[in-house]
Each structure stands twice: as structure tokens, then as C-alpha cells.
Regions:
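Beta-lactam-recognizing serine transpeptidase/beta-lactamase-like catalytic domain environment
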Residues: 168-218, 223-457, 467
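Short, gly/Ser/Thr-rich active-site loops of penicillin-recognizing serine hydrolases
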Residues: 373-379, 471-487
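Glycine- and acidic-residue-enriched helix-capping/strand-helix junction motifs
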Residues: 463-469
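Extracytoplasmic/periplasmic proteins that interact with beta-lactams or build/remodel peptidoglycan
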Residues: 1-156, 171-213
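Cytosolic beta-strand hydrophobic patch enriched in CBS
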Residues: 157-161
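Short beta-strands and strand-coil junctions in structured, solvent-facing domains, enriched
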Residues: 144, 460-461
């Protein structure tokens, strides 16, 4: 072979080698990525070639699949009470899959490796392939109470069983009905477009219970109280403190912070300070403990890390900050921000004698033949405070409901502990405040429910905004719904 021919042969050989490398790269390295690419139309067509499995609440399906007359997509997803359940289910559509629909897509489509046996049997017997089911921990009555309680208000509710970490309710309003955009028509496209944030300032697709953080306001004072007890700064909830009213904010030019209610707060005990939401006491505690200790305590309750339920919840933030900002963070202001789920976790840890359980919303994954392929077991997440200190805080929080600022949460014959909050925000804190309430109900078998409620726009009159007026009645309804199911 002469020299020019050898060059051509070498060049052709290199081209063939490059082609083989590329083919193998696509086949073996990029295969999973291409198969799961949301823009891969073949994947979408296959996903909707069969009925999906269902998401289950208390034995009932809240999702379904119906046949279509579309040439490419044989089935589309349907939702029962779609707006109410959207913060739990998410959606499965040609646009995307989210939340439980997205996390467990392979189970619901039947493509999960653990369903190989079921797929094989279906193929051999000629049965249509079906997906597995996702069995949730949700309580339908509690979810409905939260959804109807919020009504047309913008806000969120999270409810947990403190003993196990099971999520009982997860509501975000305004919401959306996923059924309106699960098909392949122009109407579906219009419905999808109308829900996008750029076209809808209310952002109904934002999961406020998990993905929005708010200044927690005075509800955070129970964390500051826990920090005081756990670090030995105060010995018991009835020991008097020595913080002035008004409180001089440190390292400022004489700035002072006072209280909304006169007469109760000078030298108040933790019980009295929680009952009447004394800013001055908790400013003093946070300042005296310092930023590092306050950050550490907040972290034991779950702050500063994402929480997976398995749906991801945004990390709540107790910030590393200067002295005056740390003092303000101790009353739930400044850069302190929390999700409703996080504040439900705070109430749950106190109600469960200081033990915080990992929150979760999926109990089981079930194959089409009803075999359980995955079971969630309750797991301890942390111990933010001792049982003794937790029980002391329970006593104080129950005084808040019985004698203090949370009278609207009272339930006849039931011990209820709670804490109200009114969180300032906006430029110069001039926006309509957020109304907060966190609570738990106690029975002879421990606490079956802890709740956090936030209402963003409950009233346009600043003087009418308050956790007791706007948020506590919703929490009460949720707690009563759970308690009714215990009987």
C-alpha cells in the first residue's frame, strides 16, 4: 500500500473508531440520562401508553388514568380534589412530573426494577401493564379542614403526627387543579401557561407549605425558650427573668424594642412571656445566649438544612449574624425564615417530649399485585431538648391557649398547646404582617397532631392581623379532624 493510501486508511480507521466510541458512549453512558430526559418524546409516549398506578390516601385513590383519543398518548392523568391535593401529589403531564408523581414516576409507570416480575407476568399473560401505587400518610379530614380553613386566603398548613413524623396534612393556597393540563390539547397548554408565575402573580404552583420561607415571628419564641432551658440560662418556665421593658437593642444608636401588651412583660417568666408574647424577654435571651448557641439550637429543630419528606422542603434559616440582628432573630424577625413544615416540626418536637421525628408522607410503595415493595419506618431526627424541658414548655404553651393570646385554639376536653405569631416583613416592615399559629393537641396516648398555619393576606387592616384571629381557628379545625379519627 502506498503512502497516500495508508493515510486514507488510517483516517477512515480513526473515523470508525470515533463512531464506535460515540455509539458506546450514547448506549451505555448517556442511556439513563436520555431515557429520563423530559424532552424525549419517545419516553413521554411510553409513559402514557399505559395507566399509571395511583397515589392513595386512607385506602382511596386521589389520582387516576383515563383513555384519550390522542394518537400518541393513550392515557392521561386525572385527579380527585386536585386543588386540595396538589401540594402532595404534584402532577404528571406532558410538561413535567413533580412532587410524589415525579419522585415515584418509575413506580407509578411500572418501570421500576422492583416491578420486573410484575411486568414479566403481565407480558406472559397478555394483561395490560399497570404501575404500582404510592400509599401516603395523609389524613383526608385534616387535609380538607386545612384547605377549607384557608379558603381564598394565601397561605399554608402543615400537620404532623409528633410520635412518628407522619405528615397528616399539607396545604398551600392558592392552589391549582393538575387535571386541567394533563392532556395534549391547546386547552391544556393554555391552562399550563396561565399557571406560570410570569402570568399569575399569585404563583399557585408554589408549594408554600414546603418551598416558601417566611419570618416566623413570635412562633419562634418557643425555640428561644428551649435554648434558654437547654443551656441553663433559665431554670424552669416559672422563674422570673430580669430583662428591661423596653429592651435596648445592642450595638445600635439607642434603638429600643417594646411589647404590644403592657403590664405583663417586665421581668416576666418564660410562661408569662409566652402567654403574652413578650418581645423583651426573648430579645434578652437571644442576645445573652449569643448567635452561635441560637444557631445550634435552631439546627437541632431542623433549621439550616433541607428536609426530605421525600419531597424536598426548602431549608429554613437561622442566620449567622451580628449582635442586634441575632437578638431580633430570637423573636422570629430579621433574617430568620422558616417553612410551615419547619414550624410544625418545632411544635411536634416539644409535644413529643423533646424527640423530633423525621417527617414523611409516604407509608408504602405497593406493587400491582399488592405486595409491599417498600415500607417507611419512623426515624428519630434529633433531640432538641430534654423530656423535662419539653414538658415544661408544654405546660407553658398550654397556658398560652388557656389563659393567653391563643384562646381560639381551645378544644373542650383536650389539652392544647400553642403559640401565636405576627411576622413583620416588607420594606421598613410596612407590608401587611403574616399571621402564624403553631400548636399541638395532647391525648392520653401522647400527641397525635402538631400543626403550623401561616396566613399571608388575611386582612388588609394591619390592626386586624393576628395569629389568634386568623390562623388559630384553622389549626383548631385540623386538630379536631385528627382527634375525631382517633375515637
Amino acid at each position: 500500500m502506498n503512502k497516500p493510501m495508508r493515510r486514507v486508511a488510517v483516517f477512515c480507521g480513526l473515523l470508525i473508531l470515533a463512531l464506535l466510541v460515540r455509539v458506546n458512549w450514547v448506549q451505555f453512558v448517556q442511556a439513563d440520562e436520555l431515557q429520563t430526559d423530559a424532552n424525549n418524546r419517545r419516553v413521554l409516549i411510553e409513559r402514557y401508553a399505559h395507566p399509571r398506578g395511583d397515589i392513595i390516601v386512607e385506602g382511596n385513590s386521589i389520582t387516576g388514568s383515563v383513555e384519550t383519543d390522542d394518537n400518541d398518548f393513550a392515557y392521561k392523568r386525572t385527579y380527585t380534589d386536585g386543588e386540595m391535593w396538589a401540594p402532595v401529589t404534584g402532577f404528571a403531564s406532558l410538561f413535567n412530573t413533580t412532587l410524589l408523581e415525579g419522585i415515584y414516576d418509575s413506580i407509578l409507570t411500572g418501570d421500576d426494577d422492583r416491578l420486573f416480575f410484575n411486568r414479566t407476568i403481565d407480558m406472559l399473560t397478555g394483561k395490560d401493564r399497570t404501575g404500582g401505587n404510592v400509599v401516603t400518610t395523609l389524613n383526608e379530614d385534616a387535609q380538607r379542614a386545612a384547605f377549607e380553613g384557608l379558603g381564598d386566603k394565601k397561605g399554608a398548613v402543615a400537620a404532623i403526627d409528633p410520635r412518628t413524623g407522619e405528615i397528616l396534612a399539607l396545604v398551600s393556597t392558592p392552589s391549582y387543579d393538575p387535571s386541567t393540563f394533563t392532556g395534549n390539547s391547546s386547552d391544556d397548554t393554555e391552562a399550563w401557561s396561565a399557571l406560570q408565575k410570569e402570568n399569575n402573580p399569585d404563583d399557585p404552583m408554589l408549594n408554600r407549605a414546603l418551598r416558601e420561607t417566611y419570618p416566623p415571628g413570635s412562633t419562634f419564641k418557643v425555640v428561644t425558650a428551649a435554648a434558654a432551658l437547654e443551656n441553663g440560662l433559665i431554670d424552669g418556665v416559672d422563674e422570673k427573668t430580669a430583662y428591661p421593658d423596653p429592651f435596648p437593642l445592642p450595638d445600635t444608636d439607642g434603638q429600643e424594642v417594646g411589647n404590644l401588651i403592657d403590664g405583663y412583660c417586665p421581668d416576666a417568666s418564660l410562661r408569662t412571656a409566652l402567654m403574652w408574647s413578650c418581645n423583651t424577654v426573648f430579645l434578652g435571651i437571644s442576645d445573652e445566649l449569643g448567635n452561635e448557641t441560637m444557631m445550634d439550637t435552631a439546627a437541632t429543630f431542623g433549621f439550616n438544612e433541607e428536609v426530605f419528606t421525600p419531597v424536598r422542603a426548602e431549608a429554613s434559616q437561622y442566620p449567622e449574624d451580628n449582635r442586634p440582628q441575632n437578638a431580633m432573630a430570637g423573636i422570629g424577625q430579621a433574617s430568620n425564615r422558616a417553612t410551615p413544615l419547619q414550624m410544625a416540626m418545632v411544635a411536634a418536637a416539644i409535644a413529643n417530649d423533646g424527640k423530633l421525628m423525621q417527617p414523611y408522607m409516604v407509608d408504602q410503595l405497593v406493587a400491582p399485585n399488592l405486595n409491599v415493595i417498600e415500607q417507611t419506618e419512623p426515624q428519630e431526627m434529633s433531640r432538641p431538648l430534654s423530656a423535662e424541658n419539653a414538658q415544661a414548655l408544654q405546660s407553658a404553651m398550654e397556658s398560652v391557649v388557656d389563659e393567653g393570646t391563643a384562646s381560639n385554639a381551645k378544644i373542650d376536653g383536650v389539652k392544647v398547646g400553642g403559640k401565636t405569631g405576627t411576622a413583620q416583613h416588607g420594606e421598613n416592615n410596612e407590608a401587611i404582617p403574616y399571621a402564624w399559629f403553631i400548636s399541638y393537641a395532647m391525648t392520653d396516648n401522647g400527641s397525635p397532631v402538631a400543626v403550623a398555619v401561616v396566613v399571608e393576606n388575611g386582612s388588609q387592616d394591619r390592626n386586624e392581623v393576628g395569629g389568634n384571629a386568623l390562623a388559630a381557628p384553622i389549626a383548631k379545625d385540623v386538630m379536631e379532624a385528627v382527634l375525631a379519627g382517633q375515637n
